Amino acid sequence: MENNETSVDSKSIKNFEVKTIHGSKSMDSGIYLDSSYKMDYPEMGVCIIINNKNFHKSTGMTPRSGTDVDAAKLRETFMALKYEVRNKNDLTREEIVELMKNASKEDHSKRSSFVCVILSHGDEGVIFGTDGPIDLKKLTSYFRGDYCRSLIGKPKLFIIQACRGTELDCGIETDSGTEDDMTCQKIPVEADFLYAYSTAPGYYSWRNPKDGSWFIQSLCSMLKLYAHKLEFMHILTRVNRKVATEFESFSLDSTFHAKKQIPCIVSMLTKELYFYH
């Protein structure tokens, strides 16, 4: 007879098996039977916008002209969605860590979700404080289920406008042409996160000094149009298409001229997310 127990796919763990456990639902933790997140708490939640424009001379990094346009548009967009928006400018690594720690220690029990937007220089896996790099995973770890209990089972959205490497995308020409009746009380600590990156791993992310970044401006535009009627992943797909098809870099340096960009969405959300209820 075939063994129906589930096993761990890891070469470092041998002969280790775990049983599939069906538990009861937890109403206190924000985990519900519905297929969409509960978004009718008394508050939508906090939206922190970290806007790093000017960097210490020691880093050798240039000012991020146009980022204030992004920060202002984000504030307007998320305030319209009823979030408590907190704008923070030119933070060092230590200040960013403290900000994230303190935010994770707040009582989010009456809030539906959490949003953090980071506008800065970056590289793969890191973003820059004004004085140097910091691992993105370190910042997001403070909001894991085992550290931030009041956000368990609630969507935690991290929106990152930053480069993820130095590759350039030249583009390519194209041809024209039933509800579950049980919910487990125990959920993974990494569940219910979504990371919306402005670009794919390894690539540059583009920003216009006058109009702001392609990604953030497209995100705000699509949220304004569709936040009241579409699920968030569907909105992000439209953001991807807008950035991919409507933008192309212009530079007197041929190396950087006529380049493209595609945002990258990494979702560990366990339900559909609607900003309306």
UniProtKB/Swiss-Prot annotation:
Q: Which residues carry this modification: N-acetylmethionine?
A: 1
- The residues annotated as the active site are 121, 163
Q: What controls how active this protein is?
A: Inhibited by BIRC6; following inhibition of BIRC6-caspase binding by DIABLO/SMAC, BIRC6 is subjected to caspase cleavage, leading to an increase in active caspases.
List the subcellular locations. Answer: Cytoplasm
Q: Which family does it belong to?
A: Belongs to the peptidase C14A family.
Top class in the EC scheme: hydrolase
Positions carrying S-nitrosocysteine: 163
Q: Which organism is it from?
A: Mesocricetus auratus
The protein's name is Caspase-3
Reactions catalysed according to its record: Strict requirement for an Asp residue at positions P1 and P4. It has a preferred cleavage sequence of Asp-Xaa-Xaa-Asp-|- with a hydrophobic amino-acid residue at P2 and a hydrophilic amino-acid residue at P3, although Val or Ala are also accepted at this position
Please describe the post-translational modifications of this protein. Cleavage by granzyme B, caspase-6, caspase-8 and caspase-10 generates the two active subunits. Additional processing of the propeptides is likely due to the autocatalytic activity of the activated protease. Active heterodimers between the small subunit of caspase-7 protease and the large subunit of caspase-3 also occur and vice versa. S-nitrosylated on its catalytic site cysteine in unstimulated cell lines and denitrosylated upon activation of the Fas apoptotic pathway, associated with an increase in intracellular caspase activity. Fas therefore activates caspase-3 not only by inducing the cleavage of the caspase zymogen to its active subunits, but also by stimulating the denitrosylation of its active site thiol.
Q: Name one GO molecular function term.
A: endopeptidase activity
Keyword Protease on entry: yes
Q: Which residues carry this modification: N6-acetyllysine?
A: 11
Sites of the modification Phosphoserine? Answer: 26
Name a GO CC annotation attached to this entry: death-inducing signaling complex
CDD domains xrefs: CASc
Task: State the protein's purpose.
Answer: Involved in the activation cascade of caspases responsible for apoptosis execution. At the onset of apoptosis, it proteolytically cleaves poly(ADP-ribose) polymerase PARP1 at a '216-Asp-|-Gly-217' bond. Cleaves and activates sterol regulatory element binding proteins (SREBPs) between the basic helix-loop-helix leucine zipper domain and the membrane attachment domain. Cleaves and activates caspase-6, -7 and -9 (CASP6, CASP7 and CASP9, respectively). Cleaves and inactivates interleukin-18 (IL18). Triggers cell adhesion in sympathetic neurons through RET cleavage.
Q: Which Pfam families match?
A: Peptidase_C14
Enzyme Commission number(s): 3.4.22.56
Record's keyword terms, sorted: Acetylation, Apoptosis, Cytoplasm, Hydrolase, Phosphoprotein, Protease, S-nitrosylation, Thiol protease, Ubl conjugation, Zymogen
